[in-house]
Amino acid sequence: MEVPRAHGVRAIAAAAEGQDGGAGCDEGAEITLAHGSPLNEDQYIMNMRDAWAPLQQMTTAVTFVGHTHVQGGFSQKEHEWHEIRPRIPVRRDRWALAIPPGTRHLINPGSVGQPRDYDWRAAFAIYDSVACEVTYHRVAYDVRAAQGRILKAGLPERLAARLKEGR
């Protein structure tokens, strides 16, 4: 499978060779991965204003972004715009989001090591291109051990403190 690169953005076929991969999805099997925004790898996408231009210029139905360390995203269908902010209570560990045909989604899976949305648990997402669904996950981990490794490495104390605060 060939992976084209352009300005820090990679378009990747979601299915392995010989698999259907995303037959139910409107835009086919391709997704886009970007560190910040698909338009600028250093851009933070924090709100609908930031998401507007990337959503307008997306060439795939789903684009995964990061940079903010905040789990969630944004969606657009015609003239409807929505912010996606999964609030996963400590008693739950996942939240599913359907990707309906005809929509575009900017998805931030969150951060395993440094969440910045005031939830200390590790955050990630799994994309199912056949079911057309993104499942956001939260997983508890040994924060004290991680804080100890940060301090032992000689890194600033504030980096260790922020882990338990999720910011």
Model regions: which residues?
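Short gly/pro-enriched beta-turn/loop segments at secondary-structure junctions
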Residues: 26-29, 57-59, 65-68, 101-102, ...
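Active-site neighborhood of divalent metal-dependent phosphoester bond hydrolases
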Residues: 1-59
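A short, charged
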Residues: 61, 68-75, 159-167
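Short beta-strand scaffold segments in enzyme catalytic cores
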Residues: 21-25, 71-75, 123-127
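Acidic, His/Gly-rich catalytic cores of divalent-metal-dependent hydrolytic chemistry
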Residues: 79-167
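Active-site environment of divalent metal-dependent phosphoester hydrolases
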Residues: 39-41, 64-76, 98, 114-119
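Active-site neighborhood of phospho(di)ester-bond hydrolases with catalytic His/Asp-centered motifs
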Residues: 34, 62-67, 106-110
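Short, surface-exposed, charged loop/turn segments at secondary-structure junctions
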Residues: 42, 46-51, 75-86
